[in-house]
Amino acid sequence: MRALLLLAVFLQAQAPAPLPGTDIYLVPLKGGLASMKTATPTPLSTAPGYDNQPFFSADGRRVLFAANHDGKQTDVFVFNRETGRVTQLTTTPENENSPTYLPSGKTDADGFSVVRSEMDKTQRLWRFNATGREPYLLLTDVKPVGYHAWVDPDRVALFILGEPNSLQLASVNSGKSEVVANGIGRSLHRIPGTRAVSFVHREPSGDYWIKQIDADSRKIEPLTKVVDGAADRDMAWMPDGKTILMSGGTKVFSWTRGASSWTEVFDAALHNLGAVSRIAVSPKGDAIAIVVAEPKR
């Protein structure tokens, strides 16, 4: 009996933590960022379970996202903004997260990349074609990958899990990666119009700063402290490459280069929505996707 109890405790400890219940909403920006405060969010995916990690296509017409509705399997879905339809792209025994359109130009024809949790739980960077087929391993020896952001068709910034978590720049062509920072957060983004990537970095003082690294020179520059009370420190860039959005509780704040503080631009609570975590911005700047905590059902 004691052995059975110990086995049960061990198995419980090994079980993965359940994914949070989250929904995705689209917030239209008909009058630029200033119109976000009065905009009405519309549901993109609100099925029971995990709907998260939205990413717009280059033309802004589609939104990739990861979803897990049965508590077991995470796959990639796509929302078509023109038809309002959601289509499942991957159906695999593995888990696919962080779907990201490949930086191929104006269309999504080259497919998308994902962080794939393989059958042995190894997490590496893979790619699929545009219809969610033909999986291909991009970086064989770089692991365990948590999140990623493309700099260009060859170079990719990676959040590598570890003690501490590290920021690495990798080349798909060479298969090699280089550690460029330690102690980073999960929110990685290429800054529009540049070959720089932003990341959240924990200072020795305990403060969290948004910083940028130039992928060519490796120069790192601080930008601003994160929003006070931001639990997950999730952020996104507006298309101008000058303005950052960051979530904090049920609110979204903006910061523009040169500003001394953050400005509130949206409150999900006014629409009876929960706390905001991840944010994605359409390349045209006409819509923002927000991930909110799922209401109790």
Positions of PLM-derived features:
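Sequence signature of WD/YWTD-type beta-propeller architectures
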Residues: 13-297
